[in-house]
C-alpha cells in the first residue's frame, strides 16, 4: 500500500453520498502525487495570491478603530471549521469541504456587500455584466491566478464556490448533479442573467454543507461585532429567537450545527427542523434591519462609490 492509498483509507467510512477522491474532475489533467485530489485543491488555494489578499479585507464593518472586529480571513476560517464539523459528522469529504470553504470569498471586494453592490452598478454601466463575489471567486481561480492560466482546481471545488450564497437560506439543500459543461454554462450565465446566482445549487453534498455553514459563521459573529461597536445590545435580540437558537455566537453556532447533523444523517441532502429554520430566518432579518442596514453612513457609501468609480 503506497502513501496516497493510506491517506485515502478513510474513504471506506464515507457516506454513500460523499464525493470520492477518484470523482475529482479537472479541466486539465495533472500528474498524481501522494496527496488526494481535493487536498491538492486546498494547497493550491492557500498558496494563491488571492488567498493572501484576504488578510486586510473587512467583513461587515469597515474603517473601524477596533482590532477585535471580524475580518474576511477570520470568516472563511470559521466557515471551514463549521463545515468540516458537519462534514465529519455526516461522513463526507472534508478535503472538498475545506477547499471550497477557504476559497468561497476570494472574489469579495473591499467594504463587503456594499462594495459588491457598488461594483455591480459600475460593471453594468460599463457593459461588463453582473458583478457577484461568488462568480469573481471562481474567476480569480480559473482566469486570473497564475498569470491568467488559473490554478486548475477540481470542478467540484469550483462549483461549490460558485454556488455558495450566504444571502439565501433554504430549509433543505439537495445537491444538483451537473456536467462540466453545465458548470461552465452556469458560470457564464451569472454574468449575463440578472439574479441567476440565486438559482444555483451545488453539485455535491459537500458544497451544500459549505453553503449553509457560510450563514452559520456570520450570523452570531456579526451580532458580537455589532455589540462591540455599541450598535445593538444583547437584550435587543427577540426572545422568540433566542429561546430556540440561543443569544450568544457559541449557542447559535452549536444549535444550528447540531440541528443540521441530527436532521441530515444518512440522507442525500441537508435539512433543518421547522422551528430552527424559522428562528434562523428571523435572526437573519433582525441582523439586516439592525446591523447591516446601519453598518455604513450615507457619507461613507458615497465615499466608497467615488473610490470604486475612480479606480474602475
Predicted regions and their residues:
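Histidine-centered, transition-metal-coordinating active-site segments
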Residues: 1-73, 78-86, 93-94, 115, ...
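A glycine- and small-aliphatic-rich helix-loop capping segment at beta-alpha/alpha-beta transitions
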Residues: 112-125
